[in-house]
A protein has these predicted regions:
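N-terminal carbohydrate-binding accessory modules
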Residues: 1-38, 69, 509
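Aromatic- and acidic-residue-enriched carbohydrate-binding clefts of CAZyme catalytic domains
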Residues: 5, 42, 47-55, 60, ...
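Short hydrophobic beta-strand segments in globular cytosolic domains
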Residues: 7, 412-413, 531-532
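Substrate-binding/catalytic cleft of secreted carbohydrate-active enzymes
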Residues: 80, 84-117, 125-268
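Carbohydrate-binding surfaces of carbohydrate-active enzymes
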Residues: 115-129, 136-144, 150-151, 155, ...
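Short beta-strands within extracellular/lumenal beta-sheet-rich domains
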Residues: 376-385, 495-507, 541-543
């Protein structure tokens, strides 16, 4: 019911954290033109608590109030999904990485240190959004408690069901205490309602295409009545590095949409518009077979609205079905944002090892993790000097997640948690240096392994089964800001990690897609914005560069290339993204 009248919610998911703030109105207009009347969004805790006790609710796309106002301006209802656990293919499922450092803390369970931290977050959030609730004349009509908790209950049978329920009830109570006074809901696969439902919250189903089963299951756990909603209806799917790009047919999505419309079932497309995992925000899955499955930078999701905000055949198919069903007017489709194709010359290079020489390392007898070093993301360089020669098989069982190995600055190989490669042959001469540059590819965001999320080298290194201890020098390389070009310059050294610097002039701005297919692995900054990771293995071969991050006149680019097997001289912007090209090595 809305203002005393029955309403069917036709919602689409779009995460404000994955879309540049200047594009929020455009994307919301696109969703309205698709026939939707609501937008759902996660709130990712770690997106707003950027360091312990430091909160950002105002800058750029951190401005949640600004997003809620934009939704209200566009006449869209809002479904808020604040977690505290979100999943969403986002780094650590939205949890701040430093929770792992708190003594006695166990995440996602009835644990006092964890609940105390959750309460601080929820109170911070409530202060930002409670005036935007529909009860106060705002656009927020529903709020979710936790997320897919039934899956976690099913995976963590070592915890008694009553303990799980005690935790989820505590989260609901925190939301109430914080001032949320609108309908609350949970979302789970319908077969997982037993562990996921919370008294006082509407159970909604994820991925449920059988309307009769939806109604039967909701009735079972909600006093024999609805309303009925599919909180995550998947028109596409998530994507991992080194795996094929996932696609779902437009016809299948349109037919399922019509089923929901005809049955009076409310639904939320997850995703209607996916956006981008800018910076180091992408998460990862875990399987026993693949160990870790890091998500690509693009969160296109094969959604009806593409990563760059374009109409797709799926958009047209859904729009057509909804227009035939609803009584309200569906507006015209907004114009596409212009595209440019710049050629960016890279004028200068400097080697990472040259920069490191001026830094002060942490000295340690044992290997330290990112968390030990108080670093959340980016890279870590482990260095050790050997006074005696040593050769043999080097075993690094705790590699998290990708590493390049060097002896006296020469690359000798790679280690890769994705492929299970944790060993390689090394030969370190007398009085020589071993370097291991480790990259965090994103913390696991789903499943029981979310509790095992340390990064760096997490177990001892051995060479010929002998543990290598003592005299480690450890350098943090967070890359949390765009590097400033130093006065020094370095000649190209094949295989060494290198920073490429360039400036370029524009007489007009627009979106573009940086072609990274000739590069190896790394990240790209433009005008201070980390566009995210690229990796030659694919399937993603281009990086989305929104035009709102560019300026008329001079622009600055920095590329951190980890593998550096070929010297690069330019970056090329192309007019079409490439997200589905795997490269088998």
């Amino acid at each position: 019911m809305y203002d005393g009248k029955p309403i069917q919610i036709h919602s689409g998911e779009m995460h404000y954290s994955r879309v540049p703030a200047p594009y929020w109105h455009h994307r919301l207009k696109m969703m309205k033109a698709m026939g939707l009347n609501a937008v759902a969004t996660y709130v990712f805790w770690n997106f707003h608590e950027t360091a312990p006790g430091k909160w950002d609710w105002t800058t750029d796309n951190h401005n949640l109030k600004g997003f809620l106002k934009a939704a209200s301006d566009e006449g869209m209802m809002v479904i808020l999904r604040p977690g505290p656990y979100a999943c969403g293919e986002w780094e650590f499922g939205g949890y701040p990485w430093w929770l792992q450092k708190v003594k006695g803390m166990e995440i996602r369970t009835y644990n006092k240190p964890f609940l105390d931290s959750c309460r601080v977050y929820i109170n911070q959030l409530a202060a930002q959004v409670k005036d935007f609730q529909v009860t106060n004349g705002g656009p927020i009509v529903m709020v979710q408690a936790e997320n897919e908790f039934g899956s976690y209950v099913d995976q963590r049978k070592d915890i008694p069901l009553e303990a799980h329920r005690k935790y989820s009830a505590a989260i609901r109570q925190m939301l109430l205490d914080g001032g949320f006074n609108i309908p609350m809901f949970t979302s789970d696969g319908s077969w997982l309602f037993k562990g996921g439902t919370i008294e006082g919250a509407l159970p909604t189903a994820n991925g449920e295409d059988n309307v009769d089963n939806l109604k039967k299951t909701v009735n079972q756990y909600h006093g024999g009545v609805g309303p009925y909603m599919v909180a995550e209806f998947y028109p596409g799917w998530l994507d991992h590095w080194n795996e094929p790009f996932q696609k779902v047919s437009a016809d299948r999505v349109a037919k399922q949409t019509k089923k929901y419309l005809d049955a009076g079932v409310s639904f939320n497309f997850y995703m209607a518009h996916g956006g981008t995992n800018f910076g180091f925000t992408s998460g990862a899955n875990y399987t026993n077979a693949r160990n870790i499955q890091p998500d690509i930078t693009s969160y296109d999701y094969d959604a009806p609205i593409s990563e760059a905000g374009w109409v797709t055949p799926k958009f047209d198919a859904v729009r057509s079905v909804i227009k035939q069903s609803v009584k309200y007017a569906v507006p015209a489709v907004p114009q596409r944002i212009p595209v440019i194709t710049p050629i960016i010359k890279l004028q200068n290079t400097v080697g990472l090892f040259d920069i490191i020489e001026s830094e002060n390392p942490v000295e340690s007898d044992t290997l330290l993790t990112f968390e030990d070093m108080n670093q959340g993301n980016g890279y870590m360089l482990y260095r050790r000097r050997f006074n005696q020669p040593i050769s043999g098989m080097m075993h690094v069982p705790g590699i998290a997640d990708f590493a390049t190995v060097y002896v006296n600055g020469e690359k000798v190989g790679e280690l890769n948690r994705l492929t299970g490669k944790d060993s390689l042959q090394v030969s370190v001469p007398f009085n020589s240096t071993l370097d291991i540059l480790v990259e965090n590819l994103g913390r696991i965001n789903y499943g029981a392994r979310i509790n095992s999320n340390l990064k760096g080298i997490t177990e001892p290194i051995t060479i010929n089964d002998n543990e290598i201890t003592g005299n480690w020098q450890i350098y943090g390389v967070p890359m949390d800001k765009m590097p400033v070009m130093p006065k020094m310059r370095s000649p190209y050294v094949k295989g060494q990690p290198t920073l490429y610097f360039g400036t370029f002039e524009l007489d007009k701005v627009g979106d573009t897609f940086l072609d990274m297919e000739k590069w190896g692995k790394g990240i790209v900054f433009v005008n201070g914005v980390n566009l995210g990771r690229y990796w030659k293995v694919g399937p993603q071969q281009t990086l989305y560069l929104p035009g709102c991050y560019l300026h008329k006149g001079q622009n600055t680019v920095v590329v951190f290339e980890q593998l550096n097997d070929e010297k690069q001289t330019e970056l090329v912007g192309v007019d079409t993204p490439v997200l589905d090209r795997l490269v088998k090595e």
